[in-house]
Amino acid sequence: MGDPSKQDILTIFKRLRSVPTNKVCFDCGAKNPSWASITYGVFLCIDCSGSHRSLGVHLSFIRSTELDSNWSWFQLRCMQVGGNANASSFFHQHGCDTNDTNAKYNSRAAQLYRERIKALASQATRKHGTDLWLDSCVVPPSSPPPKEEDFFASHASPEVSSTGWASAQPEPSLTPRNVDAPAASSEGVPEQGPSVEGLNVPTKAAVGEVSSIIKKKPNQAKRGLGAKKGSLGAQKLSNTCFNEIEKQAQAVDKMNAQEDLLSRAAPKEESIVSSLRLAYKDLEIQMKKDEKMNMSGKKKAESERLGMGFGNSRSGISHSVTSDMQTIEQETPITAKPRKKYGDDSDDSYFTSSSRFFDEPMELRSSSFSSWDDSSDSYWKKETIKDTDPIPKNTGYTDRPTTRRKPDSEPAENTDEAQKKFGNVKAISSDMYFGRQAKADYEARARLERLSASSSISSADLFDEQRKQTAGSYNLTSVLPTAPDMAQFKQGVRSVAGKLSVFANGVMTSIQDRYGS
């Protein structure tokens, strides 16, 4: 017997899961279980299937009804002869109503049900073989099962269903009334009561009422689902209505979007207008200031570049040098000495580079600095000479004096001579190769001969090192050989102060020469 195909497995489980009792989990009652316990033939959810796996395969064997495709015919027969309804009734009959998984499936009732499912599945496998359906199972209908009624499909053709329902509904109501009327008339004729006309009046009214009800029901049926279900009457809307409503909604959305854009653009325009007004006011104020100052040419450009209180300031409050500047006329003006080098330069030479001012000699400077010519100039010349001496140089090997430098030994002139000299030696050093070893040995022998008469020697004496000074002999010059004294420090401070004052005087003089005249 071969294994069932994938299509057979899907067909069988589709039918088994259509049973209402199999649509919920056997243990917890969760909807749409997709796992199954073959041992008991019940359907489980994924959480309960994990609990069954922890019990072991000897108590419960778990398979997926959707993912697993290696089902056997015996396992399918277990699911067909079992089911949630059969298992629930069997456990209830044997008094096993607990919800504890371990206690429930380790009980005597679970053991009996396992044996029963196994026996029934073996019998069904031998009897039916590879047939999809058993005699005990409900044979699937030849026609497809009725589908659930679609809401929109019922709207598409409401007249047919409603008219059929309406035509079938009033027939039972007509039959008893028609039967009662002849009975009443037949009973009235032989008896011949005292007043037959009075009896005919209510019957006509009743017939009229029946006819009115019959006429109203088809009209109510045309209203769609409202008449069919007996609830509020819902009217069918055509496709054109939906299109019109959608167009109206789109038009409303467009209008709202335009209103939002207009509302957003209005404050922006107001801010732009206000900023333009402020800009025009600033320009007017600036023009008035320019007219008052009567500045033109290089002076105006220079003042704007320096930012001397003009309209370029960020805040509303600013200090203006040019606005407070006044022209002072001297009674006996002194003509300034011509400056050839500084006159040729651009007007902003003092602000672009300051090193050129200090590089010039003292004789070329203004007469206002004559007090510095005698003292500072001579001192600077001496200071430059002094400063060059204490600056230590990073002397290399070639800058050392010749007395301390060891002459480089000449390399061997001929390689054959080196081979003859060191041919039998196993290892040689660079000193031996270049002839330095003999000189070192000579110096060592000389030191040993000099110290041979002494009773004790030290490593400093042996290697000709200078003795270290005692603790009491340390002084400032030995610890800091290049430390400056107070006189040099004072002279340095004076020189720096003199340079700063000269620079400040030069700046002020240049400003007065350019903007004061």
Swiss-Prot record:
<dbReference type="GO" id="GO:0015031">
    <property type="term" value="P:protein transport"/>
</dbReference>
<feature type="modified residue" description="Phosphoserine">
    <location>
        <position position="231"/>
    </location>
</feature>
<keyword id="KW-0653">Protein transport</keyword>
<feature type="modified residue" description="Phosphoserine">
    <location>
        <position position="275"/>
    </location>
</feature>
<keyword id="KW-0333">Golgi apparatus</keyword>
<feature type="compositionally biased region" description="Basic and acidic residues">
    <location>
        <begin position="291"/>
        <end position="305"/>
    </location>
</feature>
<keyword id="KW-0472">Membrane</keyword>
<feature type="compositionally biased region" description="Polar residues">
    <location>
        <begin position="312"/>
        <end position="333"/>
    </location>
</feature>
<dbReference type="GO" id="GO:0008270">
    <property type="term" value="F:zinc ion binding"/>
</dbReference>
<feature type="modified residue" description="Phosphoserine">
    <location>
        <position position="454"/>
    </location>
</feature>
<dbReference type="InterPro" id="IPR037278">
    <property type="entry name" value="ARFGAP/RecO"/>
</dbReference>
<feature type="modified residue" description="Phosphoserine">
    <location>
        <position position="459"/>
    </location>
</feature>
<keyword id="KW-0862">Zinc</keyword>
<keyword id="KW-0931">ER-Golgi transport</keyword>
<dbReference type="GO" id="GO:0005096">
    <property type="term" value="F:GTPase activator activity"/>
</dbReference>
<dbReference type="InterPro" id="IPR038508">
    <property type="entry name" value="ArfGAP_dom_sf"/>
</dbReference>
<keyword id="KW-0479">Metal-binding</keyword>
<feature type="domain" description="Arf-GAP">
    <location>
        <begin position="10"/>
        <end position="126"/>
    </location>
</feature>
<dbReference type="Pfam" id="PF01412">
    <property type="entry name" value="ArfGap"/>
</dbReference>
<feature type="coiled-coil region">
    <location>
        <begin position="243"/>
        <end position="263"/>
    </location>
</feature>
<feature type="compositionally biased region" description="Polar residues">
    <location>
        <begin position="159"/>
        <end position="176"/>
    </location>
</feature>
<keyword id="KW-0343">GTPase activation</keyword>
<feature type="modified residue" description="Phosphoserine">
    <location>
        <position position="429"/>
    </location>
</feature>
<dbReference type="InterPro" id="IPR001164">
    <property type="entry name" value="ArfGAP_dom"/>
</dbReference>
<feature type="compositionally biased region" description="Basic and acidic residues">
    <location>
        <begin position="379"/>
        <end position="390"/>
    </location>
</feature>
<feature type="region of interest" description="Disordered">
    <location>
        <begin position="139"/>
        <end position="200"/>
    </location>
</feature>
<feature type="region of interest" description="Disordered">
    <location>
        <begin position="362"/>
        <end position="422"/>
    </location>
</feature>
<feature type="modified residue" description="Phosphoserine">
    <location>
        <position position="456"/>
    </location>
</feature>
<feature type="region of interest" description="Disordered">
    <location>
        <begin position="291"/>
        <end position="349"/>
    </location>
</feature>
<keyword id="KW-0963">Cytoplasm</keyword>
<protein>
    <recommendedName>
        <fullName>ADP-ribosylation factor GTPase-activating protein 3</fullName>
    </recommendedName>
</protein>
<keyword id="KW-0863">Zinc-finger</keyword>
<dbReference type="GO" id="GO:0000139">
    <property type="term" value="C:Golgi membrane"/>
</dbReference>
<feature type="modified residue" description="Phosphoserine">
    <location>
        <position position="371"/>
    </location>
</feature>
<keyword id="KW-0175">Coiled coil</keyword>
<feature type="modified residue" description="Phosphoserine">
    <location>
        <position position="458"/>
    </location>
</feature>
<feature type="modified residue" description="Phosphoserine">
    <location>
        <position position="271"/>
    </location>
</feature>
<keyword id="KW-0597">Phosphoprotein</keyword>
<keyword id="KW-0813">Transport</keyword>
<dbReference type="GO" id="GO:0048205">
    <property type="term" value="P:COPI coating of Golgi vesicle"/>
</dbReference>
<feature type="modified residue" description="Phosphoserine">
    <location>
        <position position="452"/>
    </location>
</feature>
<feature type="zinc finger region" description="C4-type">
    <location>
        <begin position="25"/>
        <end position="48"/>
    </location>
</feature>
